[in-house]
Amino acid sequence: MAIHLPLEQPVILPPDPDDSAQQVAAALAAFQAGQSTASAYRGQLNAIAARYPTCLNAWAALGELALPDDVIAAYAFFRVGYHRGLDRARGSGWRGTQQLRWEDEGNRGFLRCLYGLMCAATAIGEEAEVTRIQQFLLELDPSNHFGLERL
């Protein structure tokens, strides 16, 4: 059963605190360039998440790094980011009916956490959760940034 959100003004989440998103991006760039190991990258992300527990991009990056090798850790990281994102969305006036689109950069950490949670739920066989998250993602961001199959 599809839930169809009424057309309301989309919500744009405020950015991650201070320069935490930039710190995450810099750590990722160094890791991708081979300038740091996975362990060092994880340590940087852990430090950012500890300093800025509301940094959605840090939780998303931690989950993405954990997949596919440590699905349970990934699931936990994404779940924390998802709940932190819901808190931020509600604090920004989101009432559960507006879109949170990928095109708005402030929303990307939350959407990455939600997508990652769906991927981790798939890996552990949580079919009902996968379906709910997929439907939720498509309703939040109709542009379908993640290329999900429409239900």
Question: At which residue positions do the language-model features occur?
Answer:
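Solvent-exposed loop and edge beta-strand segments that line ligand/cofactor-binding
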Residues: A50, R101-G106
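Start-of-helix signal in alpha-solenoid helical-repeat scaffolds, especially tetratricopeptide repeats
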Residues: L56, D104-N107, L111
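Alpha-helix N-cap/N′ positions at the starts of helices
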Residues: A40-G43, G109-C113
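Structural register within alpha-helical repeat arrays
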Residues: L62, F110, L117-A120
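N-terminal alpha-helical interaction modules that lie
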Residues: M1-N57, A61-W94, T122-L151
